[in-house]
Amino acid sequence: MATYIMGDLHGCFTEFQQLLDKISYNPNYDELWLTGDIVARGEHSLACLRFIKDPKNNIKTVLGNHDLHLLATLVGIKKVKPTDKLEALFSAPDRLELQHWLRKQPLMVQHPTHNFLLVHAGISPEWDLSTTLSCAREAEMILQSDNYADYLAEMYDNTPDQWQDNLTGIARWRYILNAFTRMRFCYADKRLDFSCKLPIEKAPVTLKPWLELDNPLYDTHDILFGHWASLMGKTSRSNIYALDTGCVWGNHLTIINWETKQIFRQERLK
């Protein structure tokens, strides 16, 4: 049995299947975990969702920002962008089934055997493990509740940018979502920044990648994340793995065998 973790799919279903063939993935013995952003920008988001949802494929995922945005469009909060290439999903007969399955997926996972932490964008530099786990479960309960659409309507904001234990309501929920699904850079005082999308070497000196800030959790646990394609799999910490390598942008899809730490890649098919 092998445990695999794969970076952001963004609707790249053909490359997804090619990579599974390359590693001889067997769902009867192996398990596959995904960093989220299953959908948007690529041509085959619907096929990706259906394949991942099918229990016989033994695949689990965390939610990414594009997955959350899809939920917001499905409930009518946002309009579909043509660049997201989601038209087939909106006319699919199983649209509602996929919608309700998606909103029941976790924001963060601690693997039951290997103990690694899996998340889409990152873990707040202000959280210990207990806070990370409790915040994930708290936000997931809202997504799985009957009034989840009311909360989705309020997620499109960059504030608050700093964690406080006494945050409540929408502000608390929004910080949790932004940390798990949108974070890249932070200030030295651990405030989150959402304006900079430059490569690390071109970013202002006042900003640092979240994983380079001081947080004991970053030293004690293996963390796997996606979201940040411009890192191209490179981080400053040997125990923190960046798995989004920009397949949808013409680069490649990446998967790691956790037991052996072997990396496999599938180039974008033109």
Swiss-Prot record:
Gene3D superfamilies: 3.60.21.10. GO terms for molecular function: bis(5'-nucleosyl)-tetraphosphatase (symmetrical) activity. This is Bis(5'-nucleosyl)-tetraphosphatase, symmetrical. It is an enzyme of class 3 (hydrolase). It holds the Pfam family Metallophos. It comes from Haemophilus ducreyi (strain 35000HP / ATCC 700724). Hydrolyzes diadenosine 5',5'''-P1,P4-tetraphosphate to yield ADP. It comes from the Bacteria. Keywords: Hydrolase. CDD domains: MPP_ApaH (cd07422).
